[in-house]
From Swiss-Prot:
It comes from Alopecosa marikovskyi (Wolf spider). Modulates Cav2.1/CACNA1A voltage-gated calcium channels (P/Q-type currents) in rat cerebellar Purkinje cells and hippocampal CA1-CA3 neurons. At saturating concentrations (>10 nM) decelerates activation kinetics and slightly increases peak amplitude without affecting deactivation kinetics. In vivo, does not cause death when intravenously injected into mice. In rat models, through its activity on Cav2.1/CACNA1A, has an ameliorative effect on memory defects provoked by hyperstimulation of N-methyl-D-aspartate receptors (NMDARs) in the hippocampus. This is Omega-lycotoxin-Am1f. Signal peptide: none annotated. Residues 1-18 form a propeptide. The presence of a 'disulfide through disulfide knot' structurally defines this protein as a knottin. It is found in: Secreted.
């Protein structure tokens, strides 16, 4: 009926918002297996804070591919 059509229309908008929030940087991939990153993977790596610094920081990001 009409109710089903309304549900279909609102879903893509929610998905779009979720995808945008999923690409934000994060400090950890923990607790994401059933959350934002699914069905994508969350990847972490270390990188130096700046070119003339040896200090490293951990960066994590959901990969949408």
């Amino acid at each position: 009926g009409d109710e089903e059509d309304e549900v279909e229309e609102t879903l893509p908008v929610a998905e779009e918002g979720r995808e945008k929030s999923c690409t934000t940087w994060r400090n950890s991939c923990m607790h994401n297996d059933k959350g934002c990153c699914f069905p994508w993977s969350c990847v972490c790596w270390s990188q130096t804070v700046s070119r003339n610094s040896s200090r490293k920081e951990k960066k994590c990001q959901c990969r949408l591919w």
